[in-house]
Amino acid sequence: MAGLKLQAVTKSWDGKTQIIQPLTLDVADGEFIVMVGPSGCGKSTLLRMVAGLERVTSGDIWIDRKRVTEMEPKDRGIAMVFQNYALYPHMSVEENMAWGLKIRGMSKAHIEERVREAARILELDGLLKRRPRELSGGQRQRVAMGRAIVREPAVFLFDEPLSNLDAKLRVQMRLELQHLHRRLRTTSLYVTHDQVEAMTLAQRVMVMNKGVAEQIGTPVEVYEKPASRFVASFIGSPAMNLLDGVISASGDRFELPGGLALPIGADYRGHAGRNMTLGIRPEHIALSSQAEGGVPLTVDTLEFLGADNLAHGRWGDQKLVVRLAHQQRPAAGSTLWLHLPEHQRHLFDGETGQRV
């Protein structure tokens, strides 16, 4: 197995504006890292830099302890799986999987052995003579993965491989990818805009925004302790509730526009007078009562999701979303009294957006 290291890597198209800010990442042997972020955040550009399809402006890339920054893609020991499968339509499944090995001059027996083994792992044994047009979307994606597997690369690179599949098939393919990684233990770098893919597949997640790695951590870490307001808003469905306000002069209240306020602990007294953003996830808000000092939420709409429900409403001028149990279905216009547990709240600096 082999590791991957990015050392202060940057990318600029015009020599002035850096679309990838200096970024350092160490991927351990056999680790599965997912880069996630909105369109235009730089994740696919970074993946292409690792693959050698984009030139690195500055910094270095290391694969299997070898510096590959200026190497051609074919010499880097990588295999890439694309969003659009990139299969040859006139070739059979077997020929598609074997083609890369054939042009490298491998023996016929060696090629056949690798293709048969990959087909067995991916359950493609009975499809080897078919053409891509005779396959479903999921089968085509498995062929694309098989073509990567037969190369026995040091690193797998996945560029949004499930984006073209329907919702049900994406779930199935996520499970297959998890099983495949447990079996092969090959170092993998995976790009997606889908946070569900990121959270379910990754051993560590790198959340990107405007060319910056906002946070690198386990799925649990980025969910429970988001490093910035951006991460808090991007990870989680529905998104975290974010309320802009200020720490009171006494340091014991979080004050919001319209005379609203929430008590806060003594830990934040050193931030008195500072603008802050308070965050809390919809699933961490509990039902309370007026007598218990609950926050009144006027329900605007209710989303019925089956297993649970989402109530969207207003607390004064502040918008809030709360996740409710299946049997709790408040009518529009009704009032819910809510408890925002202090240990489930997050505070972010009002200027930098960084976690306090």
UniProtKB/Swiss-Prot annotation:
InterPro entries attached to this UniProt entry: AAA+_ATPase, ABC_transporter-like_ATP-bd, ABC_transporter-like_CS, ABC_transpr_MalK-like, ABC_transpr_MalK/UgpC-like, Mo/tungstate-bd_C_term_dom, NA-bd_OB-fold, OB_MalK-like
Residue ranges constituting the ABC transporter domain according to the UniProt record: 4-235
Cellular component annotations (GO), alphabetically ordered: ATP-binding cassette (ABC) transporter complex, substrate-binding subunit-containing
SS bond partners: none
Protein's cellular compartments: Cell inner membrane
CDD domains: ABC_MalK_N
Enzyme Commission number: 7.6.2.10
Coiled-coil parts of chain: none
Subunit structure: The complex is composed of two ATP-binding proteins (UgpC), two transmembrane proteins (UgpA and UgpE) and a solute-binding protein (UgpB).
Protein name from the UniProt record: sn-glycerol-3-phosphate import ATP-binding protein UgpC
Designated gene of the protein: ugpC
